[in-house]
């Protein structure tokens, strides 16, 4: 906002110097108010970035000259504009008020502004501080992440704003009040569990505007766990269904065995159907030879598990507890059985 650049004639620079010497506060001299009531003290002005700021100076008929300065730079002297900034305009120049406006305010406009007046006796000044508030904005946040259960995870969320925003992390995939909250730019999770997967929300808030909110998804991989495998009783000639339900990330692949034989759709009138985390083995016309123990095997890249399920006829005495266990196995998962054995533990 300087005035003694190449765009101005040398005589204008002389005028500026004269103004500073005659009635404006020289650079380096402390600001003083003259008397306690004139010019009237001004409150600080607070505006949001992009808004307009109005700086008002209350004067009276004792004033012979008046000017607005930003630090040591003259913006206006009377009705004469000295600032080259098109955003700075004069609003009011009357015997009782001298006001300017700064349009589309930005953070570099923040700072002290001085209304300097000349009376018959001596110069007097009044200072106002312009405060520019900036809504919160998240500038950098972690990408979605996939980890194995038991690993450590660190999420980052960096935000800017004026005043400096408060950054809060919250786990969205749990009931309200049950998920942990971290008031920090970094969210650190040690020995992560499968129930800590889901969306995490970063919120940046400074009360200037609505909070800026971004989300990060954490996927936790874990080996299969068979959560449901129920023995089924059915009469000869009826339809029988064995069901096996497994939880796993990535999703488990299923195989069915009877003793050492891997079963497949179409074999002896059976059908295997896999839908998501559930696999079913259907017998459309149960015969005596179909009765017995079947093994459901669920696998993914992290591990393998199995459960024993029994198809039985009327009057059979069956242990009500199904055998579900982790297991080791040598299998061709997408082809024919190469070798098959289980070690339960």
Curated annotation (Swiss-Prot):
The keyword Nucleus does not apply. Disulfide bonds join 57-115, 157-202, 244-296. Residues 1-27 form the signal peptide. One of its GO terms (cellular component) is plasma membrane. Residues 323-345 form a propeptide. Residues 39-126, 136-219, 223-310 form the Ig-like C2-type domain. Keywords: Cell adhesion, Cell membrane, Disulfide bond, Glycoprotein, GPI-anchor, Immunoglobulin domain, Lipoprotein, Membrane, Repeat, Signal. Binds opioids in the presence of acidic lipids; probably involved in cell contact. This is Opioid-binding protein/cell adhesion molecule. The gene is OPCML.
